[in-house]
Amino acid sequence: MKKEYRIKRSQDFDNIIRKKQSFANRQFVIYYQKNKLEHMRLGISVSKKLGKAHERNKIKRYIRETFKTRKNYVKNYDIIIIARAGVKELPFLEVGSSIDHVLKKSKLYRKREEG
């Protein structure tokens, strides 16, 4: 994922979480905040309780790939996604549908725009 699409700084994470705009399901919690950019930015948090490094990295890869294919549907938002324990056993396609569920629930999905 390109640098301009990532949220890395702890201060940015704290600011978005402090706004308390969130939605959740059994696998993910999503915190979000409007930004002034033409695109979304994504921050991912996977707790050490979810497994060893290679398991956490796999979860993060699944999340990044899911958002890469949906970046035209979610614009002008900073999104923090926190993985819960239920995501550990899910295959890739179910991770995507679970993220879709939370995004639709939070009304962050927009009509597809080419770009």
Predicted feature locations:
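Positively charged, solvent-exposed patches that mediate nucleic-acid binding
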Residues: 1-115
